[in-house]
Amino acid sequence: EKNANSRKAIEAQVEAIRARVEYADVQPVFMEEAPFIADCFTATDAPHIVMVPFFIADGLHTVEDIPVLLGEPSARVKKRLAAGHPTWRNPTGRKGKLVWYTEAIGNEPGLVDVILERADEGKSQLSRLI
């Protein structure tokens, strides 16, 4: 059974991005539950889609599974991967839209600040116990 916390975290981020009103439309999509990644083409009327994988690192899902779910042929993805090339090329036309696919958010250098903030919270709790 799926833990709802993962979905809630993504939906909270989507709401925060929507609140900034920098993009015409912001929609969450998921690998294993609706709305699915392939639904991104019908989830918006926007002609351009920027797909940002909410993963801590680039790995199997981000470099193989998601490009295939976005319509990239599996054989092409595997061939590019074996050659050490990116498995997605920006922008790529799919279903009448242009799709840009980014790296996982965990590759963002600013994430260090979030990690340190959490560590400081832990250190603060520890200092109260000592």
Question: Language-model segments: which ranges?
Answer:
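Active-site-proximal alpha-helix that buttresses catalytic centers in soluble enzyme cores
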Residues: E1-I130
